[in-house]
């Protein structure tokens, strides 16, 4: 799956599966660090994999939600007790060493606040099994994206597990779980005939799943779903039929952006399967009917998730260069809080990697202990130090537990001790082992113009980003160069975008990540220390290959160097500056090279910038403070939740293709990118808060600047109802999402005071349209069990307003035509009045046939004529009504001039369309397919007849041999008859044997005949079925091809018509200009003053005439186009009408053939029998022979006339 290509994705995600050993439970010993008491427990997992739970000796049950579990470790990676007494108590197993039986389950609400469940198994194999199973359950992507129904089942499971020692469910747990409205809970319990006192408890068998559903329906009634149910056909009957349900799913729930061939709409039988799955009433389900209860279950079921499971799976192409991906990246990974006084933690590296991060930062400093061990800390601050070696071990432990794709280690190396740098390099080599990429891959040498390897090429590899030194010069000059480089490296951050000093080598260093701290860091640096760095730096430098940091100079220089293995880091302010000044160049840079963005130094509270800013420019490593779960981090987690949570997301195509340029500040549609229109209607909420408060919902969109809309929509606040508020407000419409592949929708819920409840971030490209539950998550991206929002989403390809009518007409032509007819009727009265006015105003000498031509309609819009309500006067009448002194009147029949330039354009007929090359080619292909099919069946028939002929010959030969033996025996007997002592009864015995033989052979031949007849019938029926099916498919393909050909030809004709219109205008202007010149020539014969006056008037009149004539011509051209478009529609409709006719004819043809077939086969067999019997009787034998000529079964290859001809020049007539 690593190299997944576009197309239909085969889902690889495995559903949750809990092993029997986890369900049955296993004995463990539980211990804590802060106590010397050990507790024997039985640890279990519920069958759905929602919870860990254990009972101790007092039969008290404790739960651990598996969605909170981050990791499961055993053996040397598990926590070990430090107290010797505790260790002695735990060493109770008799199979395996204690270290190998240790299990640590790491859990917590976020990456910082984590806890440990420490266990000891009695056997090593048990420890390994439980560790693997628990980690698998905790990291299951389908479990992290459960359906609404699964979350409600999880709440039910929790109630069933938290029972009293007597096995009863305490009602206080139900009140605690649904605490928003105690009165409602009480009423709902009473509706289920259950006790309602908080101090009561109920037997588990009384609180079945069915009772739980009834309880929920009473607690949280859903009138909005009843309305939807009624809207789709359940108005008079309490159910939807299978056809109505199919329409609902295909019209409302299906994504219109999907290809209908690759992702066809659901068929009736598929919908029936869904009905049988969700309808609780079996009798209704068998009839293909679904009740409102079943409908509600479907809406909350796994098939109706708001995001397709395929998007959660690893579904993107992972074989492109590393620079073509967004890479989940962390800044100052070791910190657990602020930048100045926060604690550093080795565990943060584990948690960050387990969460899907693929790029971590190591801020390395010189250790000041006697052991001279390098440390990781935030220099010149109050943050604590942690061991560099322990960090490397933690990275090695968790690097590939959740993703197999490469890890990038971003070293910020401040260690000025050669010895300690040598230790750092040694630790990397020894601890990472083969996972550390020491040398570049053979296919991707470190050369100019060579792209970076892909994530698939680098699977299970660790890459180091550290300063790379050049070693080409001598030792003396090398020291000088290193000194210069060190000076450059630790200069002020503004130097990052200035040209490098002449002393800097080709492999210059990047500006350090924390340039804002450089002033204070620089005081600890001096030339001698930097000069002594050479050998130690080489130790670390040898680890660097594909990620070589260099100081950024300019996009032009980077493009000229064209070295993909060089990368630069930008503090957010400088990155923003580059994005503002050179957005297109920044995107181009990121196509070939990597860039890393990190937060500015003034973010001492570890807040984050919005990563979307830099994703828009194609920056790969947009590093954030993972310890701070602000909105920026939430968007980051939403981004990397998809594509298998691999930590890599393929950039949009325009950010990868070298032949395309992309401006992230574009406001219009980008050629080649299909924009989307997204509409979100917030309908209702369920169990939004555990308090009786008002709630509201906000909707945001993040993406390109043109797509981003913060707080685009906010519902009204529900009045004291957090259980089932219903809003039913007008939807928020994001009319044009220019780059949907990089846009995400955020739906957030707040209490009336503004307190955050939960949210969900959804990629626009992954959103499924229709009615869906959006199960909310908290600010740490942990799923909330009960809170959900019910929405209706519409998502489709964006259509500009100018083409909206065209799309409407194409998608629903019948409704559109009816609407046009309705409008025409409404305007009919006014139109008739206008026509009468025009007739009255027409010239007296005008013929009746000419008058109506003056009444005009507006130009056709989308191929449908809209009759105007007010018809302006024709140009000729306008000129007559206001004659100017000395002006030349336009001719009465203005149409003559216009008609003289108009060209007749006829729509191509169906017969002409059939002559098109692509259509003829398809017909020839179909002819060949039919010919091959008939040949195959002809061969089968021939083989069958040969087989029967062989059998007949065997029967005949056997018959002749046995008859000859009997006759020979008869002759011997006749000789014996002549002897006097011989008895006379032998003659009668021979005759009886011969008669029996004839009867036996006749029966065999009859059986053979019957068998042949049946087999020939079956074979011919098989042929007819194949022919019929193939012809039916051919009809579909030919109709589709003819429709495509018609559309293509008609579009070409309309394009050509535009050219013709332009030519006609030029021709009209030319003719009118010629007339003007003639009038000017006539005026020259008059005196000069009169001539000048007339000339001026003629020019003024000419301008008016040209304007009017051009207007009339455009109207005439518009009418012509309308007629042509209408004719095009008629032809396309005629083509579509052909399909049912041809299908009916085909059905009739083969019905007749099937009816005649048994008689034809019978006649053939009988005729063959008669011919062979007469032939054999001439040779003294009676048996039937079977003809070996298949042509007698009317099974010859069809002639070219039958299949439509085989002459290339001839038009094929079958099926069209």
Swiss-Prot record:
Residues 855-871 have a biased composition (Polar residues). SMART domains: C2 (SM00239), PLCXc (SM00148), PLCYc (SM00149). Its EC number is 3.1.4.11. Residues 316-467 form the PI-PLC X-box domain. Palmitoylated. Palmitoylation at Cys-17 by ZDHHC21 regulates the signaling activity of PLCB1 and the function of the endothelial barrier. Palmitoylation by ZDHHC21 is stimulated by inflammation. It is linked to Developmental and epileptic encephalopathy 12: A form of epilepsy characterized by frequent tonic seizures or spasms beginning in infancy with a specific EEG finding of suppression-burst patterns, characterized by high-voltage bursts alternating with almost flat suppression phases. Patients may progress to West syndrome, which is characterized by tonic spasms with clustering, arrest of psychomotor development, and hypsarrhythmia on EEG. This is 1-phosphatidylinositol 4,5-bisphosphate phosphodiesterase beta-1. It comes from Homo sapiens (Human). The gene is PLCB1.
């Amino acid at each position: 799956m690593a190299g997944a290509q576009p197309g239909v994705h085969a889902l690889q995600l495995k559903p949750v599966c809990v092993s029997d050993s986890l369900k049955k439970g296993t004995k463990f010993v539980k211990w804590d660090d802060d106590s010397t008491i050990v507790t024997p427990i039985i640890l279990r997992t519920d069958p759905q994999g929602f919870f860990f739970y254990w009972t101790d000796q007092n039969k008290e049950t404790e739960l651990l939600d598996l969605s909170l579990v981050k990791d499961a470790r055993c053996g040397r990676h598990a926590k070990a007790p430090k107290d010797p007494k505790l260790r002695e108590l735990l060493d109770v197993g008799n199979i395996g060493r204690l270290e190998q039986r240790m299990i640590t389950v790491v859990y917590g609400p976020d990456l910082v606040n984590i806890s440990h469940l420490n266990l000891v198994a009695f056997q090593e194999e048990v420890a390994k099994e439980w560790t693997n199973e628990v980690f698998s359950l905790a990291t299951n992507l389908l479990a992290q994206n459960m359906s609404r129904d699964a979350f409600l089942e999880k709440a039910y499971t929790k109630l069933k597990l938290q029972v009293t020692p007597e096995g009863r469910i305490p009602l206080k747990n139900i009140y605690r779980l649904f605490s928003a409205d105690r009165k409602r809970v009480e009423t709902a319990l009473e509706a289920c005939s259950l006790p309602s006192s908080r101090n009561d408890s109920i037997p588990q068998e009384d609180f079945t799943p069915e009772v739980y559903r009834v309880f929920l329906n009473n607690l949280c009634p859903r009138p909005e779903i009843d309305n939807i149910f009624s809207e789709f056909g359940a108005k008079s009957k309490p159910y939807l039929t299978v056809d109505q349900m199919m329409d609902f799913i295909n019209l409302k729930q299906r994504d219109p952006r999907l290809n209908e061939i690759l992702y066809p709409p659901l068929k009736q039988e598929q919908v029936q399967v869904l009905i049988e799955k969700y309808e609780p009433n079996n009798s209704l389900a068998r009839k293909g009917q679904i009740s409102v209860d079943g409908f509600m279950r479907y809406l909350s079921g796994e098939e109706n998730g708001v995001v397709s499971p395929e998007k959660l799976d690893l579904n993107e192409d992972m074989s492109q260069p590393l620079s073509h991906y967004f890479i989940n990246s962390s800044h100052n990974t070791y910190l657990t809080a602020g930048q100045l006084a926060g604690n550093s933690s080795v565990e943060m590296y584990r948690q960050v990697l387990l969460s899907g991060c693929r790029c971590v930062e190591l801020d390395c400093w010189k250790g000041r202990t006697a052991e001279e061990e390098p440390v990781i800390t935030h220099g010149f601050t109050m943050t604590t130090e942690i061991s560099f070696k322990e960090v490397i071990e933690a990275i090695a432990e968790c690097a590939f537990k959740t993703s197999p794709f490469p890890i990038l280690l971003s070293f910020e190396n401040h260690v000025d001790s050669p010895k300690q740098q040598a230790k750092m390099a040694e630790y990397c080599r020894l601890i990472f082992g083969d996972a550390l990429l020491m040398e570049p891959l053979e296919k991707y040498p470190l050369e100019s113009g060579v792209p970076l390897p892909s994530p698939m090429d680098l699977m299970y590899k660790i890459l180091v980003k550290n300063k790379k030194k050049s070693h080409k010069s001598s030792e003396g000059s090398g020291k000088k160069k290193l000194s210069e480089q060190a000076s450059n490296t630790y200069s002020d951050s503004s130097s990052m975008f200035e040209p490098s000093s002449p002393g800097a080598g080709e492999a210059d260093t990047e500006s350090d990540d924390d340039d804002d701290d450089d002033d204070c860091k620089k005081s600890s640096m001096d030339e001698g220390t930097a000069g002594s760095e050479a050998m130690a730096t080489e130790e670390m430098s040898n680890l660097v290959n594909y990620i070589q940091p260099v100081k950024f100079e300019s996009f032009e220089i980077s493009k000229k160097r064209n070295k993909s293995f060089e990368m630069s880091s930008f503090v957010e302010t400088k990155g923003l500056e580059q994005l503002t000044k050179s957005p297109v160049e920044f995107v181009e840079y990121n196509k070939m090279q990597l860039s890393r963005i990190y937060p500015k130094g003034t973010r001492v509270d570890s807040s984050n910038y919005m990563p979307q800013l830099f994703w828009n420019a194609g920056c790969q490593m947009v590093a954030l403070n993972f310890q701070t779960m602000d909105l920026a981090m939430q968007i980051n987690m939403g981004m990397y939740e998809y594509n298998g949570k691999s930590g890599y997301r393929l950039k949009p195509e325009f950010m990868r293709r070298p032949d395309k340029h992309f401006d992230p500040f574009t406001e219009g549609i980008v050629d080649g990118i299909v924009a989307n229109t997204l509409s979100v209607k917030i309908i209702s909420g369920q169990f939004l808060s555990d308090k009786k408060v008002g709630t509201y919902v906000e909707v945001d969109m993040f993406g390109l600047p043109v797509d981003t809309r913060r707080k685009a929509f906010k519902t009204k606040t529900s009045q004291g109802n957090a259980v089932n508020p219903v809003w039913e407000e007008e939807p928020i419409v994001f009319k044009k999402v220019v780059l949907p592949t990089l846009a995400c929708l955020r739906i957030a819920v707040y209490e009336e005071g503004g307190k955050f409840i939960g949210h969900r971030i959804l990629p626009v490209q992954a959103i499924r349209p229709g009615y869906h539950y959006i199960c909310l998550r908290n600010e740490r991206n942990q799923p909330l069990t009960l809170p959900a929002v019910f929405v209706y989403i519409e998502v489709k390809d964006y259509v500009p307003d100018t083409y909206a009518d065209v799309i409407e007409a194409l998608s629903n032509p019948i409704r559109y035509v009816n609407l046009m007819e309705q409008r025409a009727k409404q305007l009919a009265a006014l139109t008739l009045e206008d026509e009468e006015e025009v007739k009255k105003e027409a010239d007296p000498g005008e013929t009746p046939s000419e008058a109506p031509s003056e009444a005009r309609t507006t130009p056709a819009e989308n191929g449908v004529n809209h009759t105007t309500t007010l018809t302006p006067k024709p140009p000729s009448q306008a000129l007559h009504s206001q004659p100017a002194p000395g002006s030349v009147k336009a001719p009465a029949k203005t149409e003559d001039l216009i008609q003289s330039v108009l060209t007749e354009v006829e729509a191509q007929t169906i017969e002409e369309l059939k002559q098109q090359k692509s259509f003829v080619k398809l017909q020839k292909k179909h002819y060949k397919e039919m010919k091959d099919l008939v040949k195959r069946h002809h061969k089968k028939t021939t083989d069958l007849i040969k087989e029967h002929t062989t059998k007949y010959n065997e029967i005949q030969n056997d018959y002749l041999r046995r008859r000859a033996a009997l006759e020979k025996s008869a002759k011997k007997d006749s000789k014996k008859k002549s002897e006097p002592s011989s008895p006379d009864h032998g003659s009668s015995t021979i005759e009886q044997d011969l008669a029996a033989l004839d009867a036996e052979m006749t029966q065999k031949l009859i059986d053979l005949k019957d068998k042949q007849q049946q087999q020939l019938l079956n074979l011919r029926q098989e042929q007819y079925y194949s022919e019929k099916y193939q012809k039916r498919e051919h009809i579909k393909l030919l109709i589709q091809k003819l429709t495509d050909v018609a559309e293509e030809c008609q579009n070409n004709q309309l394009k050509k018509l535009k050219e013709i219109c332009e030519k006609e205008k030029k021709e009209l202007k030319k003719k009118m200009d010629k007339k003007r010149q003639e009038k000017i020539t006539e005026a020259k014969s008059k005196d000069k003053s009169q001539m000048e006056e007339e000339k001026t008037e003629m020019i003024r009149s000419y301008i008016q005439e040209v304007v009017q004539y051009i207007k009339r011509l455009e109207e005439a051209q518009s009418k012509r186009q309308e007629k042509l478009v209408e004719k095009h529609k008629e032809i396309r409709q005629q083509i579509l009408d052909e399909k049912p006719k041809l299908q009916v004819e085909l059905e009739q043809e083969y019905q007749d053939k099937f009816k005649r077939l048994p008689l034809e086969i019978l006649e053939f067999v009988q005729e063959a029998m008669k011919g062979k019997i007469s032939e054999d009787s001439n040779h003294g034998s009676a048996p039937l022979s079977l003809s070996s000529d298949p042509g007698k079964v009317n099974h010859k290859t069809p002639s070219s006339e039958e299949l439509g001809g085989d002459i290339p020049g001839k038009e094929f007539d079958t099926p069209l």
